[in-house]
Amino acid sequence: MKKLTYLVAIAFTALPFAVRAQSADAIIDRAAAAYARLNSMRAEFRQTLTNTLTGTMQTTSGVILRRKPNLLSINFESGDRVAADGSTLWFYLPSSAPGQVIRMPYSGENASTVDPANQFLNSPRTRFTVSSAGTAALGGRATHAITLVPKHPNSAFTSAKVWIDDADSSIRQFDLETANGLKRHVVITSFTANPDLNKSSFRFSVPKGVKVVDQASGVTF
């Protein structure tokens, strides 16, 4: 009996370690599945960019809209905007590059990296080494954090820490760091799943007097 009790105790002692070892994969799998089920989404966010090389910091807020299969709009309070209208991706950044807008095809790597959630949740276990990074309450919601390290060189980031909501498996916060020393901290302050979004919300009209730089051809007009 004592031996049996001892073995049971050992089993229960080992169990939490096994659960912890599997939890990061389970969390990212749930998040990826929840993201794949979304037909549309709307999120408000607050972003802080820190450049460790220059010691500068910039904070801004904005709204991101997404509708399947290929519509995306990110509006910043600074007036900057990123928009994907179904075929073309537009980068209008008057705060840092006034007087111009960059356009490029919305496909391939362009499509996968511009959507913040997609860059983490598109085949995550194939692309990243995933590990647990603790728990936290964010805005009154329980979350689990995971760390993502690219298995292959990644121009978007060298490592990321992502907080996943325990209730709906949405992303509530993320930190990422790039090879050039840029740190990005994003907090999701509001999230709505499957809102009714009109296609006009994703349309981009070139402001008067702004030059268009076509990245594919290198032509400016």
Predicted segments — roles?
Residues 98-142:
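Flexible, surface-exposed loop/linker segments and immediately adjacent secondary-structure boundaries
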Residues 38-40, 59-61, 69, 77, ...:
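Extracytoplasmic
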Residues 17-57, 67-71, 206-221:
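N-terminal leader/targeting segments and the immediate start of mature chains
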